[in-house]
Design a protein with these regions (language model features):
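Conserved CoA-thioester-binding segment of acyl-CoA-metabolizing enzymes
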Residues: 1-59, 97
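C-terminal alpha-helix plus adjacent terminal tail
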Residues: 1-17, 63-65, 172, 176-177, ...
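Short, charged helix-to-loop "capping" segments that act as catalytic/coupling loops
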Residues: 15-16, 25-28, 59-69, 125-138, ...
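Hydrophobic/aromatic residues within transmembrane alpha-helices
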Residues: 22, 58, 71, 121-123, ...
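Charged catalytic carboxylate motif
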Residues: 35-39, 91, 98, 198, ...
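Glycine- (often His-adjacent) and acidic-residue-rich active-site loop
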Residues: 52, 60-95, 114, 145
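Crotonase-fold acyl-CoA enzyme core
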Residues: 97-212
Length: 279
């Protein structure tokens, strides 16, 4: 988006009292800007406080994009000035940590690019399922001289091991659904024709179970597996400090000159173009 226009960028479809679908809808690129974060904050609060809710699925209404990178045309201070959330973290990492800790099951249905923030949302969800043909996950930040801000340095090593986490982060490559499954980046990948039906059936099944059993089982798995908040906070601080570096700004300018931030080949094949910036 080119401004802070307050159109609805996230829609909640309450399929039943126990099962919600949250639809990301910020065309044409599903960028994450300050207004998106503000709207997401409200949804996270609703998820935390609804006593009947047991499972929520995140999906996209925008063809080609699950959730994309940040809106670099928005003012950075509009994002950083959003007050810290209940966890004490800044707004975006606070949303992700609260989602992971919420007493409901969160599922990412990934079709299209999950770039940067989209990858971070998928990692914060309890489960994620990728379209084999259409899903692309990417932590692209190192390729432009940045550090990712939503916690992938803390989450990825716990999912796939140190070496593979460093490969994903330091290569800034596009990771397709089948490789994402092999690495443990997502739970599973499916042929696109089977993707929706599987996720809906799983969510419906979980939504039929008792919330007490769901929330307590998740709480105990969280205690055994999640990074401490201090690791998430350190990543956010490094990200914000990296954005204004002259070397980062120079690489970002090259990317913008080639068509970044507009519908087209650069956004569709970001991993390829990021890999050419140092040439």
């Amino acid at each position: 988006m080119n401004s802070t226009a307050k159109t609805e960028q996230l829609h909640v479809n309450r399929k039943s009292p126990s099962y919600w679908r949250v639809i990301i809808d910020n065309p044409p690129l599903n960028l994450m800007g300050p207004e998106f974060v503000l709207q997401f904050q409200k949804i996270i609060t609703d998820i935390e406080n609804d006593e009947k809710l047991r499972v929520v699925v995140f999906e996209s209404a925008v063809d080609g994009f699950f959730l994309n990178h940040s809106d670099f045309l928005a003012k950075l201070e509009d994002l950083t000035s959003i007050p810290q959330g209940p966890t004490g973290l800044e707004a975006w990492p606070d949303i992700l940590v609260r989602l992971t800790q919420a007493p409901v099951v969160s599922i990412a249905l990934i079709r299209g690019r999950a770039t940067g923030n989209g990858s971070e949302l998928a990692l914060a969800c309890d489960m994620s399922f990728a379209s084999r043909e259409k899903a692309i996950l990417s932590q692209w930040e190192v390729g432009v001289g940045m550090v990712a801000g939503g916690g992938p340095m803390a989450r990825l090593p716990r999912l796939m091991g140190r070496g593979r986490a460093l490969e994903v982060l330091l290569s800034s490559e596009d990771i397709r659904g089948d490789l994402a499954e092999l690495y443990g980046y997502v739970n599973r990948s499916f042929p696109d024709s089977d993707h929706d039906a599987f996720v809906d059936a799983l969510a419906t099944r979980i939504g039929s179970f008792e919330k007490w059993a769901i929330s307590n089982t998740k709480r105990l798995v969280n205690a055994a597996s999640l990074p401490p908040d201090v690791e998430i906070a350190a990543g956010w601080d490094a990200c914000i400090n990296s954005i204004t570096r002259p070397a980062t700004q120079a690489r970002m300018k090259k990317l913008f000159d080639q068509g970044f931030h507009k519908p087209g080949d650069v956004e569709n094949r970001l991993g390829f173009y990021v890999g050419k910036l140092g040439s």
